[in-house]
C-alpha cells in the first residue's frame, strides 16, 4: 500500500509540474525589421528526451491583433493539457498575425477557385519562416519532427508554407483551409491530415476535398476527415479527437526528404 501511495504522489507531482507551465510571451524580429508577437510553450519540465518536436500553430482571421493573447483562443488549452504535456513534450509556437495583415495572402481571397501564391511572401508569413529557421538551429529540436497546423486563414497558410518549403515539415494539419490544388503536386515526404465541416459557409468544403484529391494523386500520405453538419468551427471536433496528438507525434520525416 505504501509503495502504491508513493507511486501516486510521484505521478501527481509530474502532472502538477507540467500543469504549472504556461506559454511564454515572446517577440521575434525578422531580418526586414518586422516584429512578430508569439507565444512559446517549452517541453514539460519532467520530459527526459534529448530532442523534441517543433510545432507551429497558425491561427485564423479572428485571432489577429497585437495583444499576444488571442492566438491562443483555439488550440492553446490542448497543448497545456497536463496529460498531453507529459505524453507529447514539444516546443510549440503560436505566432500572432497583425490585425491589418494576413498570413499567406494580401487580403481575404475574393474566390477560392484560384488561390495562387503571392509572389512576395507577406511580411508576417516571412517572419514565421525565419522564426522556424531560428528554432531549427537549437540543438534539442528534432529536425525530423517539425509539424505545422492551422485553422481557416491559418489552414491556408499551412498549405502555403508546406508547398514552399516541403523539406522542413514531417506533417501538416490544415483545418478548414484552402489552396490552389496544383500547388500540391511537388510535395514529398510530408504527411497530411485534413479536417473540414461539410456545412462550412465561410470556406467551402470542396476546398479540402480538392486538396485531398490533389495530394492523393501526387502520392502524398494524406487522410481527410469531414464532419457532417459542422460549420466553420471544424477545429473543435478535430481537437477533441482522441488520436489528434497521437497521429501527429507518430509522423517522422525520412532523411531522404530532408535538406
Where are these regions (language model features)?
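C-terminal catalytic histidine-bearing segment of alpha/beta-hydrolase fold enzymes
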Residues: 175, 191-259
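Active-site machinery of serine-nucleophile hydrolases
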Residues: 61-125
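Gly/Ser-rich "nucleophile elbow"/oxyanion-hole loop immediately N-terminal to the catalytic nucleophile
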Residues: 45-50, 104-151
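A domain-start/cap signature at the N-terminus of enzymes
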Residues: 18-54, 90, 124, 130, ...
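Bacterial Sec-dependent N-terminal signal peptides
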Residues: 1-22
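Primarily recognizes the serine-hydrolase "nucleophile elbow" in alpha/beta-hydrolase
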Residues: 133-188
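Short, proline-enriched alpha-helix->beta-strand connector loops that line the catalytic pocket
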Residues: 88-90, 187-192
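Alpha-helical scaffolding within the catalytic cores
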Residues: 73-83, 176-184, 206, 210
